[in-house]
């Protein structure tokens, strides 16, 4: 699939991987719609190109999602590709030992991570696929997962959410492939971003680097290259592409 003139929706496109992905898609000639709650970044991003359209959207709110998808669809008449990129990191053991005593993983934090990283995926994808089916679009759904989907100490909510993302990728591929919609996933390892540095201590990051055979974190551009690969390769379907520098095999 070529990207020129394709109508693409990206969740969480105002920062991090999403922001750089949007710029790359624009350079490829795509028409991009961003779903993001960070309205303050819209004016700067929309200066990049007239072909990017920002929509304030709480992806954990089904009504907000439905309205945003409808707006983009009315603007361009169709939706070809969805990249479910938005997500948050949160690290906490199930029950931690602190100087003040035992501390359980917060229920509020659990719900927020699951809502943002998993439930939102269902809300956005169901609305986009509905539009695709109405117009018989042969589209692509890209879900951003994580190597933590296999389980990672201290990340109960995040790991559970990303495991769910993998399950939905497989399930939706089995449902939608016969009608021309591919569903694929990207499973990055640890990426050199501000959110990673915020979620993990310096010593944790140093230890992670030593566990990765390439001895470094991934660059955002390397993850974006993988996203573009799974979109453009028409025979890649129903699978999760791991981009982790060899972390899993080590």
Question: Language-model segments: what does each one mean?
Answer:
Residues 125, 161:
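Active-site helix of classical SDR
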Residues 57-68, 107, 222:
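The beta1-alpha1 cofactor-binding region of Rossmann-like NAD(H)/NADP(H)-dependent oxidoreductases
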Residues 88, 102-123, 142, 165:
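Catalytic Tyr-X3-Lys loop
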Residues 89-111, 154-157, 197-200:
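Conserved mid-core segment of classical short-chain dehydrogenase/reductases
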Residues 3-33:
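Canonical Rossmann dinucleotide-binding motif of NAD(H)/NADP(H)-dependent dehydrogenases/reductases
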Residues 216-243, 248:
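C-terminal substrate-recognition "lid" of short-chain dehydrogenase/reductases
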Residues 130, 173-175:
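Alpha-helical segment proximal to the catalytic Tyr-Lys
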Residues 177-182, 236-238:
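Short, small/polar-rich loop/turn modules that mediate ligand/substrate recognition or access, typified
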């Amino acid at each position: 699939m070529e990207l020129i003139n394709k109508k693409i929706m990206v969740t969480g496109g105002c920062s991090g991987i999403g922001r750089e992905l949007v710029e790359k898609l624009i350079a490829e000639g795509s028409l991009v719609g961003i779903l993001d709650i960070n309205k303050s970044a819209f004016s700067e991003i929309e200066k990049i190109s007239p072909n990017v359209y920002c929509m304030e959207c709480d992806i954990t709110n089904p009504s907000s999602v439905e309205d945003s998808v409808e707006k983009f669809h009315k603007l361009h008449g169709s939706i070809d590709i969805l990249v479910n990129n938005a997500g948050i990191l949160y690290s906490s053991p199930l029950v931690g030992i602190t100087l003040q005593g035992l501390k359980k993983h917060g229920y509020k934090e659990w719900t927020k991570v699951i809502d943002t990283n998993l439930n939102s995926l269902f809300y956005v994808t169901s609305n986009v696929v509905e539009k695709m089916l109405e117009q018989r679009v042969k589209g692509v759904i890209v879900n951003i997962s994580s190597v933590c989907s296999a389980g990672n100490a201290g990340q109960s909510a995040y790991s559970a959410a990303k495991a769910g993302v993998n399950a939905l990728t497989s399930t939706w591929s089995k449902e939608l492939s016969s009608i021309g919609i591919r569903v694929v996933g990207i499973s990055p390892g640890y990426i050199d971003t501000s959110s990673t540095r915020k979620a993990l201590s310096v010593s944790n990051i140093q230890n992670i680097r030593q566990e990765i055979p390439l001895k470094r974190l991934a660059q955002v551009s390397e993850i974006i290259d993988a996203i573009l690969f799974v979109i453009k390769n028409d025979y890649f379907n129903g699978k999760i592409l791991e981009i982790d520098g060899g972390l899993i095999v080590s």
